[in-house]
């Protein structure tokens, strides 16, 4: 049995669904929301690589590397902002973020 395009798309759909559920079911913790966004980006990358391999074109794989780079930078900056926010406020709850308005 070979692993075809449908298998990759099914795994990507499951990861995408888990990411969406993580965002909608847990709106109180910013770290969980950030991790859910990363799951969504991972699902998109799996789709890009799967279609790129299926079509025999390398552009999708190059774009997936670009998306991974941007996602890593986004996660690093987001976590750094959360650490500073936690040190100042003592909480990372979404309800407390509106206090940052200034």
From Swiss-Prot:
Transmembrane segment boundaries: 5-25, 30-50, 62-82
Role, per record: NDH-1 shuttles electrons from NADH, via FMN and iron-sulfur (Fe-S) centers, to quinones in the respiratory chain. The immediate electron acceptor for the enzyme in this species is believed to be ubiquinone. Couples the redox reaction to proton translocation (for every two electrons transferred, four hydrogen ions are translocated across the cytoplasmic membrane), and thus conserves the redox energy in a proton gradient.
The name this protein goes by in its record: NADH-quinone oxidoreductase subunit K
GO biological process assignments: ATP synthesis coupled electron transport
Compartment annotation: Cell inner membrane
Topology relative to the membrane: Multi-pass membrane protein
Domain of life: Bacteria
SS bond partners: none
Family: Belongs to the complex I subunit 4L family.
UniProt source species: Bradyrhizobium sp. (strain ORS 278)
An example Gene Ontology CC term for this record: NADH dehydrogenase complex
GO molecular function, one term: NADH:ubiquinone reductase (non-electrogenic) activity
UniProt keywords, alphabetically: Cell inner membrane, Cell membrane, Membrane, NAD, Quinone, Translocase, Transmembrane, Transmembrane helix, Transport, Ubiquinone
Subunit field text: NDH-1 is composed of 14 different subunits. Subunits NuoA, H, J, K, L, M, N constitute the membrane sector of the complex.
Keyword Translocase: yes
Catalysed reactions, semicolon-separated: a quinone + NADH + 5 H(+)(in) = a quinol + NAD(+) + 4 H(+)(out)
InterPro entries assigned to the protein according to its UniProt record, in alphabetical order: NADH_UbQ_OxRdtase_chain4L/K (IPR001133), NUOK/Mnh_C1-like (IPR039428)
Keyword hit for Cell division: no
Alphabetical list of Gene3D superfamilies matching this protein: 1.10.287.3510
EC number: 7.1.1.-
């Amino acid at each position: 049995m070979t692993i075809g395009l449908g298998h990759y798309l099914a795994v990507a759909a499951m990861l995408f669904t888990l990411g969406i559920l993580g965002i909608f079911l847990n709106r109180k913790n910013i770290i969980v929301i950030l991790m859910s966004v990363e799951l969504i980006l991972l699902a998109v990358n799996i789709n890009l690589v799967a279609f790129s391999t299926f079509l025999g074109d390398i552009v999708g794989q190059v774009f997936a590397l670009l998306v991974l780079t941007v996602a890593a930078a986004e996660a690093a900056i987001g976590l750094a902002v959360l650490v500073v926010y936690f040190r100042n406020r003592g909480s990372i709850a979404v309800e407390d973020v509106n206090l940052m308005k200034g």
